Amino acid sequence: MARTKQTARKSTGGKAPRKQLASKAARKAAPATGGVKKPHRYRPPTVALREIRRYQKSTELLIRKLPFQRLVREIAQDFKTDLRFQSSAIGALQEAVEAYLVSLFEDTNLCAIHGKRVTIQPKDMQLARRLRGERS
């Protein structure tokens, strides 16, 4: 709707405005929400882009070390019991796993963009793995 210019008009001699009672004036002066200011929220794309820049800049491991170590030991139990791991071996495994996952998510994102979407879906990951020759 277009804005229109307001022009001054002469009063037509109506009733004079009545004075409000003190309690009514106090009620109107107080905000209806109780004076609680809502915390500032960024729009979702802003936060996502900030996180992307942050993690692309960083070099630290993204998966916590102890949960990853427990997972490796649990998987290794299926193949041979009483296996021992050097801490450097677990570190090397974690580096390799994270590099693989980052690369896979990059390819998955490209598949989603190719499908004219910005949200990755399981079918994008399946396509990325299939194109890599990892899954027939």
From Swiss-Prot:
Chain intervals with Low complexity compositional bias: 19-32
Pfam families, per the entry: Histone (PF00125)
Maturation and modification: Phosphorylated by ark1 to form H3S10ph in a cell cycle-dependent manner during mitosis and meiosis. H3S10ph is also formed by ssp2, promotes subsequent H3K14ac formation by gcn5, and is required for transcriptional activation through TBP recruitment to the promoters. Dephosphorylation is performed by sds21. Mono-, di- and trimethylated by the COMPASS complex to form H3K4me1/2/3. H3K4me activates gene expression by regulating transcription elongation and plays a role in telomere length maintenance. H3K4me enrichment correlates with transcription levels, and occurs in a 5' to 3' gradient with H3K4me3 enrichment at the 5'-end of genes, shifting to H3K4me2 and then H3K4me1. Methylated by clr4 to form H3K9me1. H3K9me1 represents a specific tag for epigenetic transcriptional repression by recruiting swi6/HP1 to methylated histones. Targeting to histone probably involves clr3 and rik1.
Compartment(s) of residence: Nucleus; Chromosome
Modification type N6,N6,N6-trimethyllysine: residues: 5, 28, 37, 80
Stretches the record annotates as Disordered: 1-45
SMART domains: H3
UniProt entry tagged with the keyword Phosphoprotein: yes
Record key words, sorted: Acetylation, Chromosome, DNA-binding, Methylation, Nucleosome core, Nucleus, Phosphoprotein
Subunit architecture: The nucleosome is a histone octamer containing two molecules each of H2A, H2B, H3 and H4 assembled in one H3-H4 heterotetramer and two H2A-H2B heterodimers. The octamer wraps approximately 147 bp of DNA.
Modified residues (N6-acetyllysine): 10, 15, 19, 24, 28, 37, 57, 65, 123
Name of protein: Histone H3.3
Modified residues (Phosphoserine): 11
